[in-house]
């Protein structure tokens, strides 16, 4: 298959992923197999493998390979975080999302974190979150738009 045809298949796969059609995306990705050394290909394939085949170890391995090639690309962090969520590893997913935000404010990462209900850190970090000082200072500061 020519390079242009592989690129076209991969573009179709990315569109299918965006539409939530992982089965179709995995089919396109498998057809574009000569792109196996490209990080975005690895990362996208990893997400599809996790969603379709439920093979989380393989998916995590593929996505980590993509991160080795491009550690500063937040899309790879997003995909790895989604894989961790599918595998039921919420703490690792959040950690991965935070790592991705260090490399750029990706709206998709922020959206995933919002779905998870990530809370802001307490105003007084040395006190418990439930402590009245933390509770009411947080409410007050958010009313004034300072938090």
Residue ranges of model-derived segments:
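Amphipathic alpha-helical segments within well-ordered protein domains
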Residues: 47, 64, 81, 97-98
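Long, contiguous interaction/recruitment modules in multidomain scaffold/adaptor proteins
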Residues: 1-5, 20, 139-147
